[in-house]
Structures are given as C-alpha cells and as structure tokens.
Amino acid sequence: RATINSMFFTIPTIMTWTRIVAIPLIIGVYYLDSLKVETQNLIATVMFVLFAWTDWLDGFLARKLNQTSAFGAFLDPVADKFLVCAALLILVHMNRVHVLIALVIIGREIAISSLREWMAQIGAGNSVAVHMVGKLKTTVQMMAIPFLLYDGILFGSIDTRDWGAVLILIAAILTIWSMVYYMKKALPEIRARVK
C-alpha cells in the first residue's frame, strides 16, 4: 500500500515540485530593486533554465529509479504549465511578449487541461494522451522563454530578443496545432455522448 511519502515525495516528484516552487522565486527577482535590470534578467534566465531542466530530469529519474507513479504523471505537465504561464505573464508585463500570444498559449493550456480532465472522468483519457506535437510545443516554449527573459546580446552577437520573438511565435503556432490535434482526437468521444 502506497504511503503519502512514496506518492508525493519521491526523488522525481520532488524535482517536479521544484518547478512550482521556482515560480515565486523567478517573479521575486524582478522586485529586487537593488539589482540592475540586466542582472535581474540574467538571474531569472538562469533560474528558469535550471528549473525547466528538471522537466527532463524528473522523467529520467522516475524511469531510472523505477519510481513512476500516477501522481507524478499528473504533476509533471501541471508544473510545466504553471512555470510557462507565470513566465509569460512576467514577459507580457515587461512588454517582451505580445498579450495575444500569451493568451493563445495560456488559453490552450487551460482548455486542453480541462479537456483531459473530462476525458479521464469518462474513461477516455487515452484518446488525448500526450503526443509528439505537444512535447514539441513545450520544448519550443522552454527555449523561447529564456531568450526573452535575458533580453540582450549573448556571446557578443546573438540578439536573444530576436531569437525569442521567433521562437515564441513558433510556440504559439505549435500551441494552436496541438490544440486542434487533441480536439480532433476527443471529438468522437464527445459526439458519442451528445447523441
């Protein structure tokens, strides 16, 4: 019988929890008035990259340590969504991401998360299981956000603002594509229950 610790506090789930804990820390950096904006950007970028890396690490550890669980499978994408959405809100506030792009991405996350929850309740969760396009969307988001947080020139020649703008646009396109994909997968189940 699973204990509370074995469900919620395995090494992989602790790594996942850190992504949620990261949110107020990253936001808090921008309230440290004693730091220059460039320093705030650098710290927030490094923190985001480190915490986003745990998305790969927790999955690797879960398989390596044989500590996969239903709770871990649930928490992992939730932590990703919280981290990405919080970062997008910061970037909108700082005029580094257009509000429409942020609304598309955040709106999709809410819509598909709700769809998945409903499909799971009716026993059809497998029809909207995570697909490669969804994983690609998350990867591009995780690449775009650090560039936009840094907001400067990297290694003397890489303008992270330009790269970030292109990547977040690609992420928005993938966001819409993945939403259409999941909706099409769910449609037969929805129609069957409307009849």
Can you name each region flagged by the protein language model?
Residues F9-I14, S69-D76:
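Short, amphipathic, aromatic/basic-enriched membrane-interface segments that mark the entry/exit
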